[in-house]
Amino acid sequence: MKKISALLFLSGFIFSLVADDHAEKPLKGLLVTGGGHHDYGFQQNVIMEGISQRLPVKWTVMFDMDPRESKSKLSKEGWSDGYDFVFYNHCFAREDDKAFIDSIVKVHEDGVPAIAMHCAMHSYHIFIKDQKPEEKSWNKLMGVHSHGHGPHVPFDVTKVSEYADHPAIKDMPDKWRTPKGELYFILKVLDGTKVLAYGDNGPKHKPEKPQACVWVNQYGKGKVFATSIGHHNETVSTKEFLDLITSGVRWATGR
């Protein structure tokens, strides 16, 4: 009896070791956040906790309301070293230092995956005046040119049937509605970008036509997942939004 008990204990111990060895190792994620017009203090916690409940991630946060502080940190050599992905939830629309912006883009062109939401689409390009929108490095990284938005009303998000089984969105419902919203104008979808879902404000609100609101892009060696959804805390806190950005992280990092 003792031999049987010892054998069962040993078998259980070995199984535990094997299970631990095959457990999903945490990704290392850098959340770059801060700036104007949004409750970034609240959203950073919701985003990190929401993703980590669905996918193991060890987070580092770079939270700066002052664009000069954020720029200083993102200008340091090797700022992205050791991270499996960088998540941008920030709003620094007035940045006009092209060399600085190009240096951030180079990090992802060289292979670091990028996740971007909402006002990241309005950051780092509007005040660059000597290039066409489609030529600006940040827009090329994001995969779209966006400027402006509609009113604060809920909107419907509908998957594109052609890409309904894309890994970054396949587990999402075919259609869902945001509790609150601020639908961004996507003035141009750049070559190579795959739009996975469109947002629709309805006929009474601008923009009158559905706008791309979830998409993926490949920029150099780096995968990019982006969504323009996410202005209000109520929307960022929904299961649908947290499921969506987690799927984006999984796709971009190969998890």
Specify the residue positions occupied by each region the protein language model found:
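A glycine-rich, often tryptophan-bearing local segment used as a flexible ligand/cofactor-contacting loop or short
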Residues: 32, 93-171
